[in-house]
Amino acid sequence: MATANSIIVLDDDDENEAAAQPGPSHPLPSTASPEAEAPSSSEPHGARGSSSSGGKKCYKLENEKLFQEFLELCKTQTADHPEVVPFLCNRQQRAHSLFLASAEFCNILSRVLSRAQSRPFKLYVYINELCTVLKGHSAKKKLNLAPVATTSNEPSGNNPPTHLSLDPTNAENTASQAPRTRGSRRQIQRLEQLLALYVAEIRRLQERELDLSELDDPDSTYLQEARLKRKLIRLFGRLCELKDCSSLTGRVIKQRIPYRGTRYPKVNRRIERLINKPGPDTFPDYGDVLRAVKKAAARHSLGLPRQQLQLMAQDAFRNVGIRLQEQRHLDLIYNFGCHLTNDYRPGVDPALSYPVLARRLRENRILALIRLDQVISFYAMLQDGGEEGKKKKRRARLHGPSSHSANPPEPSLDSGEGPIGMASQGCPSASRAETDDEDDEESDEEEEEEEEEEEEEATDFEEEEDLEQMQEGQEDDEEEEEEEEAAGKDGDGSPMSSPQISTEKNLEPGKQISRSSGEQQNKVSPLLLSEEPLAPSSIDAESNGEQPEELTLEEESPVSQLFELEIEALPLDTPSFVEMDISFFRKQSEEPFTTVLENGAGMVSSTSFNGGVSPHNWGDSGPPCKKSRKEKKQTGSGPLGNSYVERQRSVHEKNGKKICTLPSPPSPLASLAPVADSSTRVDSPSHGLVTSSLCNPSPAQLSQTPQSQPPRPSTYKTSVATQCDPEEIIVLSDSD
């Protein structure tokens, strides 16, 4: 029990001495207790405890004395800032009691005090250093509970019954704490020895010269030094854990950067947490700062617009970048070099005495800045190019399906269908980007069509001028043809031949034909059914410039001749391409009489293609009907208007019989094919007008001449030469 009491008294004395604050009355009982209890303790543990308590007591008193001297110096030097001394006292009170009574703190105080006395202008630097050390060894809140419990039991230390009641618990606590402290001391000593060994090895490696041949060697001196420094840092962190102190050494790069750049404390706190985030030393970019600002605004419902958030993030990124650059620059200045450069002083710089060296250093600095800018700009361009490439790939991925769906041929624009309508019907869930692209494509197509129409109008105007010149030059040929036809007839006095001869002459406007529409239809239909295409040999003969063979109608009745003459005298205002061929000679408003197909186009026999007859002026005819240029172009660009080449028809009589020369179309269906309706025509560039290299005008070109030539009310004259090849005209004129 005595040993237990002595152990308890010694432990209480040690704890009281460790937790005691500097004062005149408190050290008296603590100093008296070990003197009274020391003889009674005969065990080695008690003797070692008394010696350790005496050492702690000595360091504690000396540390208090040095700290008071430092405070007095601060009072005299920092009269303008009276808050410095209370701040130091507060830091000293928060520090751990074991550290305050240690030799380490004594060495730090003596060094700081001596430097502050020798260099008073750097007093705040040494104050900051001392505050950093005290903060690193500050006691935790959970550790403050033990001293409070012991101090609360101090008044009961004089009463023996209370000591007897607390003996078992205190004995167990001291028995469990004693081996733990001894084990931690061994670990601390071993780690300190390893640290000293690493420091000596690092110094030895720093003193060695680095050869250029060792740069590629994995075991070169600078790589070994870097590995040892990493191990040294890990050992130092482990040592701080065992000593229960902070690992902050006051390095500039490890200091926390406060940020107050915006008006919103929540945003400032989020940015400060970002730049002071533990872990790898990464420099935040603009995207990181912008995300932090957006998160803070969304979490705290700041209600800031997007533009203001972007401006705030830009300002914060600039300020943070400047602060981090300054921090890294100062850290490089403070930690650059090694123990070999510790003796360097600014006044002994060799560049001050050697101007060549100073100039070379300035040139190297300028070159370094230029190369740094080049590297930064190079990788900035790579980053921009990568972002642009990603955007293009994303656009291609989004617009890929839309381009494939737009491949089918476009329907007619007149019928209300187009690329937009098809896209909306085929894929109703198309995105806005796809519709925008389709709108752009449609606008481009419309512009192309307008340009093509303008070009066609220009070419049509030129062709009209050529046609006028060609018509003037062919008037003589026209007169010769009329004379040949008149001479070829033997003056037959039958009633059927007189209308045929009269139609080739100039007709008076007052003449009329008293035929009903029903009779005309019955007369036209047999002739249409009896029409047959020619043999291919006639086509070859025509291509070689020879006169085509004549088909002799041996058994032609007078009724059929009358049918033929009446068909030739019909007005040429049909919706087919015949009206487009001869419309510049005459235009009438009366609807012609031809067989009507399903699509509304007129089917006309091959005899109506010939222009050898001048049409009559009907009695009930109205003013001439004019069509617009666009409608004529659409009608003239149909399959018949582009493919059919009209031939001259000559009527002769041989041996008292009428001989009829029929045209030879390129295909049997050319004269019977219906004309496409203008409302269903595809208005695309592929259906443009086809012009010939010869002087043979196309039907669409001939259809536009009446716009510049007003209709003649009196006499109409048909020119056969304008509806055939110039070569054939020459052949026919030479046949006489």
UniProtKB/Swiss-Prot annotation:
A motif (Nuclear localization signal) lies at residues 391-395, 624-630. Residues 1-55, 148-185, 387-558, 602-736 are annotated as: Disordered. There is a cross-link at K142 (Glycyl lysine isopeptide (Lys-Gly) (interchain with G-Cter in SUMO2)). Residues 180-216, 430-490 form a coiled coil. Residues 149-179, 495-504, 513-524 have a biased composition (Polar residues). Residues 1-160 are annotated as: Necessary for interaction with USP7 and ATRX. Residues 729-736 are annotated as: Sumo interaction motif (SIM). Residues 183-417 are annotated as: Interaction with histone H3.3. It comes from the Eukaryota. GO terms for molecular function: histone binding; nuclear androgen receptor binding; protein homodimerization activity; RNA polymerase II-specific DNA-binding transcription factor binding; transcription coactivator activity; transcription corepressor activity. The modification N6-acetyllysine is found at K511. The modification Phosphoserine is found at S25, S213, S412, S424, S494, S497, S557, S576, S664, S667, S684, S698, S733, S735. GO terms for cellular component: chromosome, centromeric region; cytosol; nucleolus; nucleus; PML body. The modification Phosphothreonine is found at T459. The keyword Heme does not apply. Sumoylated with SUMO1 on multiple lysine residues. Polyubiquitinated; which is promoted by CUL3 and SPOP and results in proteasomal degradation. Ubiquitinated by MDM2; inducing its degradation. Deubiquitinated by USP7; leading to stabilize it. Residues 28-55, 525-538, 669-679, 697-707 have a biased composition (Low complexity). Residues 622-736 are annotated as: Interaction with SPOP. One of its GO terms (biological process) is cellular response to cadmium ion. Its main location: cytoplasm. The Sumo interaction motif mediates Sumo binding, and is required both for sumoylation and binding to sumoylated targets. Belongs to the DAXX family. This is Death domain-associated protein 6. It comes from Chlorocebus aethiops (Green monkey).
